[in-house]
Amino acid sequence: MAAMAALQSSFTSLSLSSNSFLGQRLFPSPTTLQVKTEGHSPCLIVMRIKRWERKDCKPNSLPKLHKMHVKVGDTVKVISGGEKGKIGEISKIHKHNSTVIIKDLNLKTKHVKSKEEGEQGQIIKIEAAIHSSNVMLYSKEQEVASRVGHKILEDGRKVRYLIKTGEIVDTPDRWKEIQNKKESETAVAVAA
C-alpha cells in the first residue's frame, strides 16, 4: 500500500499520467522493494507475478486424462455446491479436468450475440460443468447415495457397484439402453 502511494505521489510530482507506462513493466518480474516505515527497521517485500499455468500434458502435448468414478448415463446426487441435494443423470464428462455435465442442473445464463444483420441476440440457459468430486452415484430403487466400488464377477467381467446397497451399476442391458438413447438424440439433431 505504502509503495503504491509513493508511486502515485511521484507521478503527480513528475506531472506524468499513470497511462504513460501502459503496457510496460515498471520492475523486473521477481521484484524486491524496500519499504521504510517510521520507527521500524526497513523490511523486504518480495513480489512474484504468477504466470498462467497449463494443464499437465503428455509428451505429445495432449492433456492427461483423469480416471473418473462416474460414466455417461449414471444417476448421481450432487453433494456440494449450489445444486447440493439435487439428483440428475450425467449427459457428458470431461476427463481432462474431471468435470461432468448433468441434465437440467447447474444452469447458467449465457448472452449470445446475433450472427447476422437483422437477427436478434439471445439469452440462453446452458448446463455448466460440476467437478466429479462433488457428485455421488445414486440408487433409484433404494433412494440412497453411495460411494462406488469395483469387483470382478464370476464370469470375469469387472463391474462397478454401490458400496451401501451392493447394487451393480454396470449391466449390459443398461449400456445398450444408453447407446440407443444417444443414437436417437443424434438422429433427431441431424434431422433438425
Curated annotation (Swiss-Prot):
InterPro entries: KOW, Rib_uL2_dom2, Ribosomal_uL24, Ribosomal_uL24_CS, Ribosomal_uL24_KOW, Translation_prot_SH3-like_sf. It comes from the Eukaryota. Keywords: Chloroplast, Plastid, Ribonucleoprotein, Ribosomal protein, RNA-binding, rRNA-binding, Transit peptide. GO terms for cellular component: chloroplast; mitochondrion; ribonucleoprotein complex; ribosome. Residues 1-47 form a transit peptide. GO terms for molecular function: rRNA binding; structural constituent of ribosome. Pfam families: KOW (PF00467), ribosomal_L24 (PF17136). Coiled coil: none annotated. GO terms for biological process: translation. PROSITE patterns: RIBOSOMAL_L24. It is found in: Plastid, Chloroplast. Gene3D superfamilies: 2.30.30.30. Component of the chloroplast ribosome (chloro-ribosome), a dedicated translation machinery responsible for the synthesis of chloroplast genome-encoded proteins, including proteins of the transcription and translation machinery and components of the photosynthetic apparatus. Belongs to the universal ribosomal protein uL24 family. Component of the chloroplast large ribosomal subunit (LSU). Mature 70S chloroplast ribosomes of higher plants consist of a small (30S) and a large (50S) subunit. The 30S small subunit contains 1 molecule of ribosomal RNA (16S rRNA) and 24 different proteins. The 50S large subunit contains 3 rRNA molecules (23S, 5S and 4.5S rRNA) and 33 different proteins. HAMAP family: Ribosomal_uL24_B. This is Large ribosomal subunit protein uL24c.
